[in-house]
């Protein structure tokens, strides 16, 4: 089919080439032979009057012209997929839809397990692929490579729609045998102790509390860096180190292993976890259904959490919201905090 001189099938080939960056892989992805894909490249170059790709070994390197086309082509194909091809009514009970979700280990353990359990009852054939943070999660949303991104709202891009899930608090944790935690934690003691901290993404960027401290000119002695909050409690066992993690996750581990929760010596900000999805999924019935499930379960969990803190937590009840913090936007900070 041609539209203003362009064979629309060539857009499918172009998208595969720009996504895979390899001729063989792109041809395999759309079930074309390599000669047919090479012919498609020649026709694309002729139509756009641009080389589009150069070879570096076996890798296809996009020209600036191809880079400029990548987003619009992907969005056009996704719009056709969602608005024209997949316009049938969504039936959760019969669907075998796969949702790809980027989220932290914290949100997987304390929140998304609820989603998995509920979906197993309501839509048993629906599948999930839970992915670790990348350094550019917003770009994955734009390309339609993931369905949802779950992280603190503070670090979300304004380019995609979003909805808040629940607020969370940061607390300090340590081993119950840690004698330095037998009394209220002072800032001097906190600063002198060895810390275990979680960092995220391939670049191991700092998490929220580390960023907060750096913004205020404070620096801790970090002795161990782990790739997720769930690794902090095991590393703290039988040591005099301290860690910082979300309260709900700390309570989860407190019930399963020796862990002591203590109030931070400085007012670490609370933060709001939120969910974000590609703008072109706004009217997708499956995405709408999944968003409703996410928001309902978040509301249920927030209601369950409205209880007095445990005595050992002694959590400060004063409001400490992230949005009240002055943020230096020149600071290199990933959208992959939690």
Curated annotation (Swiss-Prot):
| Keywords, alphabetical | Activator, DNA-binding, Nodulation, Repressor, Transcription, Transcription regulation
Query: What is any Pfam family matched here?
Result: HTH_1
Query: What InterPro entries does this protein map onto?
Result: LysR-type_TF (IPR050389), LysR_subst-bd (IPR005119), NodD_PBP2 (IPR037416), Tscrpt_reg_HTH_LysR (IPR000847), WH-like_DNA-bd_sf (IPR036388), WH_DNA-bd_sf (IPR036390)
Q: Show the PROSITE patterns listed in the entry.
A: HTH_LYSR
Q: State which residue ranges cross the membrane.
A: none
| Ranges of the DNA-binding region feature | 23-42
Query: Which positions fall inside the HTH lysR-type domain?
Result: 6-63
Q: Which Gene3D superfamilies match?
A: Periplasmic binding protein-like II, Winged helix-like DNA-binding domain superfamily/Winged helix DNA-binding domain
- Asked if the keyword Glycosyltransferase belongs to this entry, the reply reads no
Molecular function terms from GO: DNA binding; DNA-binding transcription factor activity
Q: Which purpose does this protein serve, as stated in its record?
A: NodD regulates the expression of the nodABCFE genes which encode other nodulation proteins. NodD is also a negative regulator of its own expression. Binds flavonoids as inducers.
Family in the record: Belongs to the LysR transcriptional regulatory family.
What name has this protein been given in UniProt? Nodulation protein D
